[in-house]
């Protein structure tokens, strides 16, 4: 590798590349979430018959992974670059390897392996065939073909490529700590994020108000159900995301037992499944507007038969 790209140059390179492959460049969704997969740009759009190609950076919060800004690789919040393509291109793996080349990583000069790691997200009733992508022994990407999202079978199949930006940048810049990553010329990752990492870790593990969080979960769940009763999928999904983040805060604080944990996950999953079914029903009511006219007319005729 010649020039060591900054963190923001890595993002810009990936954005331009996937834009050239036909992806819309979306912006990070403005609600806390544990992974880019939970964005409505992936979760909702991966289901139903309409095509969808999108790429976006997603800050992902995992309260239990916080380490007060002291661990070089474990973070309360990390950044994912998410690519979602439906239907999945037959050459999606080749497209991915080409993206690495643009980042200065030549597949002929490095040990790049696709290690089978089938993916499942119990909170959203989602699963798929998956692989971890290992670069010289370090995982940098999760590669998934969705089989089920929100309890619904995906047809056509959606391909998801999730780059771990911190890990990728650490490798490209040859640094051992994420806090030493150069975000922009002259500005280190730690100068931006170390203090927030410390404060969020302290809040998650020591300060958070458990009683308030428990009450909030109940209120968010009730509001999500109320929205779904009125077929308001997107407001409902916002509250489902709030339920998920609130549960993660409770879990990090040790406020839920093993039995209670399973119960909370089931409650979130049930909401996600209803949201998924409602979303598909609403898209059908609208006539699947992203389908071409011939496919739309054929599909609607088959569903009415």
Curated annotation (Swiss-Prot):
Gene Ontology terms describing biological process: glycyl-tRNA aminoacylation
Q: Which UniProt keywords apply?
A: Aminoacyl-tRNA synthetase, ATP-binding, Cytoplasm, Ligase, Nucleotide-binding, Protein biosynthesis
What family does this chain come from, according to its entry? Belongs to the class-II aminoacyl-tRNA synthetase family.
SUPFAM superfamilies per UniProt = Class II aaRS and biotin synthetases
Q: Which CDD domains match?
A: GlyRS_alpha_core (cd00733)
Annotated protein name in UniProt: Glycine--tRNA ligase alpha subunit
Question: Under the GO molecular function aspect, what terms does this record hold?
Answer: ATP binding; catalytic activity, acting on a protein; glycine-tRNA ligase activity; transferase activity
Q: Where is the protein localized?
A: Cytoplasm
GO CC annotation terms, alphabetical: cytosol
Enzyme Commission (EC) number: 6.1.1.14
Highest rank taxon of the organism: Bacteria
Q: Does the UniProt entry include the keyword Hydrolase?
A: no
Q: Which gene encodes it?
A: glyQ
Q: Where is it mainly found?
A: cytoplasm
Which reactions fall under this protein's catalytic activity? Answer: tRNA(Gly) + glycine + ATP = glycyl-tRNA(Gly) + AMP + diphosphate
Quaternary arrangement and interactors, per the entry? Tetramer of two alpha and two beta subunits.
- Whether ATP-binding counts among this entry's keywords is yes
A Pfam family per the record: tRNA-synt_2e
